[in-house]
Amino acid sequence: MSAPKPMLFTPLKIRDVTMRNRIVISPMAMYCAENGYLNDFHSHHYAKFAMGGAGVVFVEQASVIREGRITNGCLGIWSDAHAQAMRSMVAFIKSQGSTPAIQIAHGGRKSSTQRAWEGNGPLTQKNFDNGDEAWTPVGPSSTPLAEGWLKPRALEVEEIHALTVAFRDAAKRAVEVGFEIIEIHMAHGYLLQSFLSPLANKRDDEYGGSLENRMRFPLAVARAVRDAIPQGTPLFVRISAVDWIEGGWEIEDSVELSRHFKEIGVDVIDCSSGGNLVTGATNSNLKREPGYQAEFARRIKAEVGIRTEAVGLIRTPELAEALLQKNSADLIAIGRQALFNPFWPHQAAEQLGANEAFENWPRPYAWWLSKWKTGLLAKGESLNNWRA
């Protein structure tokens, strides 16, 4: 009797979309766009992950308005032209058997900053000399992210309403060019998460103060997007389950928020953490170890009854499989591991005994690799060493 197929390589159907396995390529900003437009770098970058066997390939956060970009190199989806530039890339991802997905976002008080490798802080004269432009970041309040960062302008109520529409329209554009999953970015200190966190939100109107008020704008965005996209299109939301800072957002808040998301029709909670940098130390309880955020996914899944996605230092197929088997999550996201090895999903399948004949690899690769493996076996070499 053959061994049961690893859960990591079982399909998952959500609404009208079936993912071929439970591996998700997490959205990671590349800071390589020009005026918000996707270019050849992005097309090749995302093609690797689809060929590498991931169930879902997320395109990095795309800003819903021009001034919502984190950096001058960030992707945008604030116009039809920006969305249309992604169409052929989306089609290729799908042609390789992966589900194309996109994260839509607004950088909030982290906007108008340097690219990560330039320092990840406020723009300098060197940036301006290189052609970068600056704009005023916005947030729930005028509280800057940290000492030395630009002071954001507090959004007016009318602007909050306009941004809700911008998220809605961005989601509609994404679906029109073929994206099959939409994720709203509500984590890592960006605009929507800064409304949730008491560390950033100091408003005294209907969008600040109580938990109910702080959730109002993010929930309005989720509702607008859910109403705008087809019923068969899954909607994910990425959250920071905790701030990791005393007096900040806690897991109990995330559980309550997720209950509201479930009522709206959100399908998956993508459980990350942190990002609201403030002057002072991060909570000493933060220990970055393999799977350190998976407990947040487990708790939200158990207490809310909603699907979750675990992310964060999930480096081995064995850990990914164990998290699924323990019912800690429904999907497993990898990021830097996929950058280091885009073929991690295919190799994980072989390692867990789910892809012995390379049947899930791109056909040309499968043919060559099968011959290679056969040759090694003929020489009497150990199967334990064939990948070396």
Specify the residue positions occupied by each region the protein language model found.
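Flavin-dependent oxidoreductase catalytic cores
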Residues: 1-388
